[in-house]
Every structure is written in C-alpha cells, then in structure tokens.
Amino acid sequence: MRFTKSIKFSLKCGRFFIMFTTMLVKKFSPKFTALFRTLLYAIFALIILCLLVDRGISFYVRDKIFTNIDELPFRPCALVLGTSKYTVSGKPNVYYDSRLMAAKSLIEQQKVNYLLLSGDNRTLQYNEPRAMFRDLRKMGVPKTLMFRDFAGFRTLDSVIRADKIFQVKTFTIVSQKFHCERALLIAQAHNIDAICFVAKQPELHFSTQIREVFARIKAVFDLILGVEPYFLGEPQPLPNSTTL
C-alpha cells in the first residue's frame, strides 16, 4: 500500500512540475522548447526509475525483516554491520550505539550464539570492528562470542565475506531498517540465507534518504556487473554453534 501511494504521489508531483516548467519555456523558440521538454521527460523518468528501485527493494525483502525480537527466528550467527562511532561533528553516532544494543540483546535473548563484527579498517585511526569489539566487551558481551572481519569495507563485502570467507551459511544481519533492506537484497542475489533484526534509528533526514536511494541504485548495478568484495582469500570458518 505504501509503495503504491509513493508512486502515485511521485507521478502527481512530476505532472505538476512538467506543466509548470512547460509554461515557463513557452516564450522560447519551438526548437529550444522541444529540447527542454525532452530533457525534462528524461529527468522525470530517471527519478521515477530510482523511486521504483528504492521502493521495490523494500517490498522484495519485507518478509525477512524483524523488529520484534520475540518473533525473530534463531540463527547461529549475527552479522553486525559497522559504522563510525562518532559523527563528523564529533557527537556519538546513534546508529552505532543502536546496532551494538541490538547485537547485545540477540546474545542475551539467545537468538544467536555469536557475533561477526564487520566493518571498515582502512587506517590505524579508523577501525570499526575493533571499536565494536571493545564497546561490546564493556557492555558485557564475552569476547569468546565475538569475531571480527576487518575487510567489511562495504555492505557488499560484509555480506559476501560472511558466506565465502567465514563460512556462515545462515545468519541474522543487524543494522537499521533502510540498511538492512539493501543488505538483504545483496544476500538474496547471492543465494545467502539471511534475515535482519532492525536496530532502532532516529527519524531519517531527507539527505539520508536521498543517499540511501543512490546507494541502492549502486547496489543494483554492482549485482548486475558481478562486483566482488575488495578482498577474498582462504576460508576462515567460524566455529559451529554447538562448540560455543
């Protein structure tokens, strides 16, 4: 229903925009007007395509997203997707804090047996898996239940490496809903059995929503082109849940 309403609203806005701009260019030559109208239609079609991809992804993975921990099926492992601990302004990142709280709750509620912390590790000063590991230890999660993937540079890397490198064949992704949806798209495209437990998130700013639309477009192109993680290598299987 929400998907249909979004498309109808976009079409109404598009028609109004085209009518308004067409009125503005009537003073120009017919040749210029035709060129402008063609360009306008192309831009409008591109916007509609982006919205279709964005809403289509949300609809496609809707059955694999869980917000209630009581309804979440058990999986041996949770893949916790990394993000920066602090914002650009130096304030605590609520997305980061919420993901750690969600990961901790999965351990406490015995919805998973261990955590795979995956994130960026490009420099000595910026290390998402290390930060998550340290903070989860402070939150009381035993270090024996946590493993780190230092090559989770992108969502695509984190999801595929969990399967190919760490040999985790079924797992729960932990992140905010908009991020979960993109991660699940990647997982399903690679025949990876994954579900998602949604971490709490603040109200999304418009800029965040726009960035996510473009991130989803890029994810679709990556899947079409068969883009692989930056780093693969020898498998490093995580212990079976029965050994923990």
UniProtKB/Swiss-Prot annotation:
Transmembrane helix recorded as keyword: yes
Natural source organism: Haemophilus influenzae (strain ATCC 51907 / DSM 11121 / KW20 / Rd)
Highest taxon of source: Bacteria
Gene that specifies this protein: sanA
Membrane topology of the entry: Single-pass membrane protein
Keywords annotated in UniProt: Cell inner membrane, Cell membrane, Membrane, Transmembrane, Transmembrane helix
Periplasmic side: 53-244
TM helices/strands, residue ranges: 32-52
Cytoplasmic topological intervals: 1-31
Subcellular compartments: Cell inner membrane
Name recorded for this polypeptide: Protein SanA homolog
Keyword flag NAD: no
Gene Ontology cellular component terms for the protein in this record: plasma membrane
UniProt function note: Participates in the barrier function of the cell envelope.
